[in-house]
Curated annotation (Swiss-Prot):
Protein name listed in UniProt: tRNA-dihydrouridine synthase B
Record field: catalytic activity: a 5,6-dihydrouridine in tRNA + NAD(+) = a uridine in tRNA + NADH + H(+); a 5,6-dihydrouridine in tRNA + NADP(+) = a uridine in tRNA + NADPH + H(+)
Active site per database record: 103
UniProt source species: Pseudomonas putida (strain ATCC 47054 / DSM 6125 / CFBP 8728 / NCIMB 11950 / KT2440)
Keyword tRNA processing: yes
Length: 337
């Protein structure tokens, strides 16, 4: 894998944790970077700075100790507000500004932001030029292939982005209308890569080392954005990086390591958000970690009723202890047979 540069920053590999609202908070970003991500991107931050005073918004902003280069994603539909938000985030420590024109959520699109912007190429150009002019750090862009299948203008938007001075482009291989259904359009991503000279990253359905290599080979992109596949599996980055580098699979993490990672993640969530909010946010992450494990579904129902940090950690330890005992019993029966 050749090194990928975004402006003055050389990434340690070409695998990026995709920004996901409600998921890629500081604890998760830090964990994914430690487990192999070449770069991580913050949760989406509104360009409406009047909303930044809420506790929720302040937690979404960049923090000391965030992995570098610190990339912050902003969203909005007004060029001057976007420029001001970019400037404020850079003053707060952001080293890269990422512009969201890919989010398909109704509450974002209804405000003429996210992927709704793809319907107005003139506004796209205005926003990109305004943000690039406002800051002296690299500006990147995330898009979809278009608004719907009858209006797939990702190629045009990519060219507009390059002309505006965007330093790298991430493309989710679906239209806004597709949401997350159907197959990702890797052919469209490949065409976009061929049309511009800036680094292009593919996003969508990259769930395994083999899929990662196939997408890189078929599209010719410079790197990959991995989002949903990292939920409950933050070690996917080191698995893909190792496979791309050596052609061999890393062994899956042992039960003890999964337990250590999950407990580390819980402790970070509790410390970052405080006990009440931390307990609440931890529930979905634990659900993702244990979704495919025997007894995970039943455990999640019990775990979601827990109301304090110590009980959460104790119950996770008990779950893994029971799993180890179960595996030892199964191994013993296998030997006896």
């Amino acid at each position: 894998m050749s090194a990928v540069r975004i402006g003055q920053y050389t990434l340690r590999n070409n695998l990026i944790l995709a920004p996901m609202a409600g998921v890629t908070d500081q604890p998760f970003r830090t964990l994914c970077q430690r487990l192999g991500a070449g770069m991580v991107v913050s949760e989406m931050v509104s360009s409406d700075m009047s909303l930044w005073n809420s506790r929720k918004s302040s937690l979404r902003r960049i923090h000391e100790g965030d992995p570098e280069p610190r990339s912050v994603q902003i969203a909005g539909g007004d060029a001057q507000m976007m420029a001001a938000a970019a400037k404020a985030n850079v003053e707060a420590g952001a080293q890269i500004i990422d512009i969201n024109m890919g989010c398909p959520a109704k509450k974002v699109c209804n405000k003429a932001a996210g992927s709704a912007l793809l319907r107005d190429e003139a506004l796209v150009s205005e926003i990109l030029h305004a943000v690039v002019s406002a800051v002296d750090v690299p500006v990147t862009l995330k898009i979809r292939t278009g608004w719907d299948r009858a209006n797939k203008n990702g190629l045009n938007v990519a060219k507009i982005a390059e002309q505006a001075g965007i330093q790298a482009l991430a493309v989710h291989g679906r239209t806004r209308a597709d949401l997350y259904t159907g197959e990702a359009e890797y052919d469209t991503i490949g065409a976009i890569k061929q049309a511009v000279s800036i680094p292009v990253f593919a996003n969508g359905d990259i769930t395994s080392p083999e899929k990662a290599r196939a997408v890189l080979e078929t599209t010719g992109v410079d790197g990959l954005l991995i989002g949903r596949a990292a939920q409950g599996r933050p070690w996917i980055f080191r698995e893909i990086e190792h496979y791309l580098r050596t052609g061999e699979h890393l062994p899956a993490p042992q039960l003890d390591e999964v337990e250590r990672i999950l407990l580390e993640h819980l402790a970070a969530l509790h410390a970052f958000y405080g006990d009440v909010m931390g307990v609440r946010i931890a529930r979905k992450h634990v659900g993702w970690y244990l979704a495919t494990r025997p007894g995970g579904k039943e455990f999640r129902a019990r775990f979601n009723a827990l109301e304090d940090t110590q009980a959460q950690c104790a119950n996770v330890r008990a779950f893994f202890s029971e799993r180890r005992q179960s595996l030892e019993t199964e191994d013993g029966q296998g030997v006896a047979a």
